[in-house]
Amino acid sequence: MKMKLGTNLGFAINKYIEPEVWAKIVREDLDLKSVQFVADLLNPFLPDDYINSQLMRIKEAVKKYDISVDSIFTSAFTRVNHLMNPDAEARKIWLNWFKKLFWIGSELGCKTGGSHFGILTFDSFEKNYDFLVEEGVKGWQELSFHAKELGYESLIFEPMSVPREMGNRVSESIDLMNRVNANCGIPMKICLDIGHAPHPDERDPYPWLEKLGSVSPIVHIQQTVLNKSNHAPFTPEHNETGIIKADKVIAALEKGGCEETIFMFEIGHREHWDTEFKIIADLAESTRYWREWVKE
C-alpha cells in the first residue's frame, strides 16, 4: 500500500494562522511535506481581494518550504448544517460557498476536497429527514461536476458520530456515497476519521478501516479511547491508554484492499495552560511515532 503522512491544518486555527508560520512548522518542526488546508484559515465568505492576496502568501509559503496542499476541508468553525440546512436559501448560499472553497483549493493544487456530508437539526431530523438528505445528495452531485471542471479527481465526506450528522454507521456511509455517485462528475469518496465514536454497535475503528479504507484517499488520524473522539497526540502518555496503533491501522486498510492513502493528523489542543505550550512538541512526537511505519 502506498502511504503518505501529513497534517490537517486545524491545529493552526487561531494559533499559527500566518502562512509563513504554519508552513515553517509543518516542514521544519514536524518534518512533513503534505497538508490538508482548512476553510477556517481562508473562509470563502471573505472578500475576493483579501482571498486573492492570501492565496499569494500561501503559495509563496508552501513553495518556499516544499509543501504539497493535497486537499481542502471544512473545520471547527465551518462544521455547520450547510447543504442540509432546513432553510432553502441557506442551502443555496452554502452550495455557492463550497464552489468557492473548491476554487480556493484548486488554486493551491488540491485534487480532492470535502466536508462532513451535512447536519440536520433535531427538528428537521424528525420532520424532514428524507427530503433534506436528498437535498444533500443533490448538492454534492452538483459540486462534483463543478469540482471536475476545477481539475479535482474526487470529493470526500467524513462519517460523523451521531445520526443527525450523517454516516454514523458503515452501511449509511456507503449508501450516501453511492447515492451521490449515481450521478456525479467525479466520484464521491470517504475521509475516514479513526477516532470518531459513531453508533454504539460500531465503535471499534478497525472494521471501519477494513470496510471503507479502499474508498478513503485520506484518513484522519488521532489518538483516542473507545467511545470518545479525543483528537489527542500520539505521545507515549496517550499511546499507553489509546486504542489507535499505527501497525493495526495499516493492516486493517491493507486487509480491506486499500492501495493508496494519505494519513492526515487531526490533533487538537484546547486553550488550556497545560496544553497551550506543547502543541508543536506533541505534533512532532506524533510524527516520530508514525514514521516507524510510514517512511515515504
Predicted regions and their residues:
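Short coil-to-beta-strand
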Residues: L30-K33, V62-T74, S106-F117, P217-V219
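Aromatic-lined substrate-binding rim segments of carbohydrate-active enzymes
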Residues: D48-D66
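Histidine-acidic metal/acid-base catalytic patches
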Residues: M1-G6, I13-D31, K63, G109, ...
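Active-site acidic/histidine proton-transfer and metal-coordination neighborhood
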Residues: K64, N81-K189
